[in-house]
Amino acid sequence: MQTNLLKPKAINVEQLGHHHAKVALEPFERGYGHTLGNAIRRVLLSSMVGYAATEVTIAGVLHEYSSIDGVQEDVVNILLNLKGVVFKLHNRDEVTLSLRKDGEGMVTARDIQTPHDVEIVNPDHVIANLSQGGKLDMQIKVEKGRGYMPGNLRRYADEVTKSIGRIVLDASFSPVRRVSYTVESARVEQRTDLDKLVVEIETNGAITAEDAVRASAKILVEQLAVFAQLEGGELAAFDAPTGPRGNASFDPILLRPVDELELTVRSANCLKAENIYYIGDLIQRTENELLKTPNLGRKSLNEIKEVLASRGLTLGMKLENWPPAGLDKR
């Protein structure tokens, strides 16, 4: 009797638009279409990394409930329009951009001054309209993040440095706009009880639909890999090693450098300054210990905790016989 589960062999990508596609995979054993389709959909909607405007400073504006002479939109509408600009950063996690324009006319995302490693996917997106004599001068902070972050939850390492007039935005980092999936019937030779999974996805253009599905699958693999380490009812990663300080007794994720956590540059540099090079080093530190690190404040701590939680880890964990022998402490 055949006991091996079928694995999908045929993958078809159908482009429905510039940022809209269907990805079909088959064949799956009966039931696996819904099992994997629902998991991929939830990850695509909640856990994709992207870029968004998080803070704005507008010349002559102290708060968002203001209006600007010569600008048709009030500040609230300008901020709403700004949230529709799609940014893509290369080789950096945050950047502050400038937008300066005066005179009658339309202000679009194309008017934002960007360095060579910052891309605006929708340059024709309208931000504001200026009347005769109108002027708009603003600084826009763009950051890398995951999912959705309300502005009232953002914390600053030092409130004293918070400048007057800085407006914090609710940030939707996810590059995925819509996701749905359907399960159809598939056939292999004489078997007709198989599933075909069709995932329909629309993005904002910062990532292709195929890359988004690929990234979501990678996240699922990383999460499920922890279950493969189960041994004796506990995670093998935290069991005492069977050999003399051997790497085999630790979960592979703990041996990865902290750079793979994709933290902001500020957070990553603070950790390296404290000789925290590996994820295994990091999870053994407590919140209080990290807060004593120079230049690492509550905002960075929350970021670290969220990234670790997405991988099933927390601060303050105990690892016996860490570090393993031969681990490079660069």
Curated annotation (Swiss-Prot):
Q: Which residues lie in coiled coils?
A: none
Q: Which GO terms describe its cellular component?
A: cytoplasm; DNA-directed RNA polymerase complex
What keywords appear on the UniProt entry?
DNA-directed RNA polymerase, Nucleotidyltransferase, Transcription, Transferase
Q: Which terms in the Gene Ontology molecular function aspect does this entry carry? A: DNA binding; DNA-directed RNA polymerase activity; protein dimerization activity
Q: Where is this region: Alpha C-terminal domain (alpha-CTD)?
A: 250-330
* Reaction catalyzed: RNA(n) + a ribonucleoside 5'-triphosphate = RNA(n+1) + diphosphate
Q: What Gene3D superfamilies has UniProt attached to this entry? A: 5' to 3' exonuclease, C-terminal subdomain (1.10.150.20), DNA-directed RNA polymerase, insert domain (2.170.120.12), RNA polymerase, RBP11-like subunit (3.30.1360.10)
* Residue ranges, annotated region (Alpha N-terminal domain (alpha-NTD)): 1-231
Gene Ontology biological-process annotations? DNA-templated transcription
EC main class here is transferase
The record's listing under Pfam families reads: RNA_pol_A_bac, RNA_pol_A_CTD, RNA_pol_L
Q: What is its EC number?
A: 2.7.7.6
Per the record, the domain of life is: Bacteria
Q: What does this protein do?
A: DNA-dependent RNA polymerase catalyzes the transcription of DNA into RNA using the four ribonucleoside triphosphates as substrates.
Regarding protein family, the annotation reads: Belongs to the RNA polymerase alpha chain family.
The record's comment about this protein's domains reads: The N-terminal domain is essential for RNAP assembly and basal transcription, whereas the C-terminal domain is involved in interaction with transcriptional regulators and with upstream promoter elements.
Quaternary structure per UniProt? Homodimer. The RNAP catalytic core consists of 2 alpha, 1 beta, 1 beta' and 1 omega subunit. When a sigma factor is associated with the core the holoenzyme is formed, which can initiate transcription.
What is the name of the protein in this document? DNA-directed RNA polymerase subunit alpha
